[in-house]
C-alpha cells in the first residue's frame, strides 16, 4: 500500500526486531491515516526537496514492539505520527534546518548528532495536524553518565 508517491506502508512498518521476535507490527486504520499524513507532510516533501531517497530507520511501532525495544507505548511512533530517518550524503544538521525552516511539524529531534561528524545521528520528526503541531525542536544527546538528555535546538 502506498502512503505517498515514494513511501509504502511496508517501508514504514519494517522492523528487524518485530521479525526476529514474531511481533505483529501492523497498524490499524487510524494509525495508517496518521502514517499517510506523516508521509505527505514530512517525508515526501523532504524526498522531493533533496531528490534523494529518505532512509527510514524506524516508523510505526506496535505496542508490543514498543515494549520489546524499551520504548513508551504512548510514543508518537505507536500512533503512526513519527519516523526516524536520514538521507545518506546530507548532513543531519542541514536536513533538520531545512525541515525547521520549511515544514509544519509537531516535533523534530536531532538525535545524537555530533558537530564534528556531520552524518552522525538521525532525525526524529512527527506530524499531527496543522492545528495540533507544536513545532517543538530538540536535540538529544548522552550526558556524562551516558543517559539521554534533551535540550532546545536552534540550527546555526
Predicted regions span which residues?
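Extracytoplasmic cell-surface/polysaccharide-interacting catalytic and binding patches
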Residues: 1-49, 142-156
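Short, flexible, solvent-exposed loop/turn segments with mixed acidic/basic and small polar residues
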Residues: 68-78, 113-116
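Extended, low-complexity, intrinsically disordered C-terminal regulatory tails
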Residues: 43-70
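A generic structural signal for short, non-catalytic loop/turn and secondary-structure boundary residues
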Residues: 2, 49, 78, 117-118
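Catalytic cores and adjacent binding grooves of peptidoglycan-active enzymes
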Residues: 87-156
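Structural recognition of the beta-strand scaffold that forms the well-ordered cores
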Residues: 55-57, 82-86, 124
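Acidic, His- and aromatic-enriched active-site or binding-groove loops in soluble protein domains
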Residues: 74-93
Amino acid at each position: 500500500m502506498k502512503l505517498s508517491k515514494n513511501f509504502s506502508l511496508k517501508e514504514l512498518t519494517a522492523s528487524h526486531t518485530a521479525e526476529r521476535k514474531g511481533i505483529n507490527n501492523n497498524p490499524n486504520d487510524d494509525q495508517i491515516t496518521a502514517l499517510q499524513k506523516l508521509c505527505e507532510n514530512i517525508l515526501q516533501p523532504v524526498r522531493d526537496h533533496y531528490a534523494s531517497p529518505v532512509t527510514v530507520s524506524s516508523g510505526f511501532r506496535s505496542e508490543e514492539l514498543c515494549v520489546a525495544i524499551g520504548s513508551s507505548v504512548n510514543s508518537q511512533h505507536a500512533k503512526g505520527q513519527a519516523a526516524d530517518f536520514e538521507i545518506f550524503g546530507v548532513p543531519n544538521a542541514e536536513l533538520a534546518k531545512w525541515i525547521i525552516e520549511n515544514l509544519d511539524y509537531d516535533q523534530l529531534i536531532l538525535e545524537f548528532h555530533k558537530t564534528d561528524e556531520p552524518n552522525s545521528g538521525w532525525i526524529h520528526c512527527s506530524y499531527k495536524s496543522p492545528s495540533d503541531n507544536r513545532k517543538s525542536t530538540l536535540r538529544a544527546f548522552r550526558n556524562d553518565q551516558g543517559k539521554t538528555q534533551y535540550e532546545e535546538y536552534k540550527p546555526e
